Amino acid sequence: MKLKVLPPTLRKNNRYLALDIKVKSVISKDDLVNIVWHGCIRFFVENGTGNFSLWVMKFYELEKTDEYNHYQAILRCQREYVDEVRASLALIYKHNRKDISVSTIGLSGTIKACQKFIEK
């Protein structure tokens, strides 16, 4: 028996956050996933963070300098929890004893529209 596809009215509404990341060490997409999850778990505990439906959709490496490495990413979360995710991302300041800065540069309803905020 084939499973039926959920109609749009019953699907979860997602929002996509464009993130700007500056860190003093080299990170990968998997490291960013860990950074985001640990930041949200520290601020909202596991019970609240499980509802966020966090997912790193895209990860871009922009530049490497002597002082820092610059990355940008697109993060998916549920519409109802956008403010909570942004708050927990703002509180991230260390990763592996290195300074890190994560800021939100844009918010959108689709990935295509969110890519307008990303520098390539």
Task: Identify the role of each PLM range.
Residues 48-49, 85-87:
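Intrinsically disordered, low-complexity regions enriched in proline, serine, glycine
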Residues 76-83:
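Helix N-cap motif at beta-to-alpha junctions
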Residues 15, 71-73, 100:
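Core residues of folded domains in eukaryotic genome-function proteins
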Residues 1-27, 33:
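N-terminal, charge-rich interaction modules
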Residues 64-74:
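The conserved glycine-aromatic submotif of the RRM
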Residues 21-64, 103-106, 114, 118:
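Surface-exposed, low-hydrophobicity interaction/linker segments
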Residues 40, 91-100:
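A common structural junction motif
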